[in-house]
């Protein structure tokens, strides 16, 4: 059975890095019975830090030692095939998907997760779990082989969702940008995840998790946006 935890963000307000979701991750690993297993960490989205720095930051902030970064393995694809749990950190989704394709890992990760290997990721790691990465918020742009992503969650994900416009900003709001995506991709569904929310996938069902009563938005072409409350579940 597919098991995944897709987190909108690594931080929530001023709680600090991974602090708001640390217990969610702990519970997820325990529920999936991999608490004592090694988690394969994929740091490729971390443009601003080295792979070693990213790995150590996650170990320190999660206070969890059973993490090994994929860059330390001589054969990345074999590391995925043998992984007991997989984690992808946030950062730049373009760079992340570029390297996942470069090392031929996209299909390997998808197959492992479909076979029941637990997967969790935040920000770019949640975005890339969707059907494509085309609702990312990211710059700079580095061209991956394809925008098709892991398809663990068979729809679009927009992490770090924030509603409305910043005072003095004359560009499009996030809602407007996502509506534009739907105009040119009319069969797609977008799930917009505010910071502090997550999707917990079990098989073909998903449940919204959240720090507060901040709903996930389900957006479809020429349809009214649906608000999915924390604690509610839906079919994939």
Label each region the model flagged.
Residues 87-90, 113-132:
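Catalytic nucleophile loop
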Residues 2-34, 46, 51-53, 135, ...:
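C-terminal and late-domain segments of enzyme folds
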Residues 93-103, 167:
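Glycine/threonine-rich flexible loop motifs
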Residues 41-42, 48-93:
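A glycine-rich, hydrophobic loop/mini-helix early in the fold
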Residues 102-116:
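Catalytic-core regions built around general acid/base machinery
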Residues 81-82, 115, 152:
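Alpha-helix C-terminal capping/helix-to-coil transition sites in glycosyltransferase folds
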């Amino acid at each position: 059975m597919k098991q995944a935890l897709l987190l909108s963000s690594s931080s929530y307000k001023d709680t600090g890095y991974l602090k708001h979701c640390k217990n969610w991750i702990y519970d997820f690993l325990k529920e999936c019975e991999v608490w004592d297993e090694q988690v394969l960490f994929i740091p490729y989205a971390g443009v601003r830090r080295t792979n070693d720095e990213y790995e150590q930051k996650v170990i320190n902030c999660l206070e969890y030692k059973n993490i090994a970064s994929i860059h330390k393995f001589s054969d990345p694809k074999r590391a995925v095939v043998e992984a007991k749990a997989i984690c992808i950190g946030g950062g730049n989704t373009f760079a992340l998907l570029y390297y996942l394709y470069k090392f031929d890992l996209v299909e390997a990760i998808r197959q492992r997760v479909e076979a029941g290997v637990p997967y969790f990721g935040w920000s770019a790691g949640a975005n890339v779990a969707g059907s494509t990465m085309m609702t990312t918020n990211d710059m700079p742009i580095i061209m991956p082989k394809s925008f098709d992503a892991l398809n663990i969650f068979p729809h679009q994900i927009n992490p770090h969702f924030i509603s409305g416009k910043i005072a003095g900003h004359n560009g499009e709001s996030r809602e407007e940008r996502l509506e534009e995506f739907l105009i040119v991709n009319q069969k797609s569904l977008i799930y917009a995840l505010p910071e502090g929310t997550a999707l917990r996938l079990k098989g073909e069902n998903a449940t919204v998790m959240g720090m507060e009563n901040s709903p996930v938005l389900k957006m479809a072409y020429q349809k009214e946006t649906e608000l999915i409350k924390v604690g509610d579940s839906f079919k994939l």
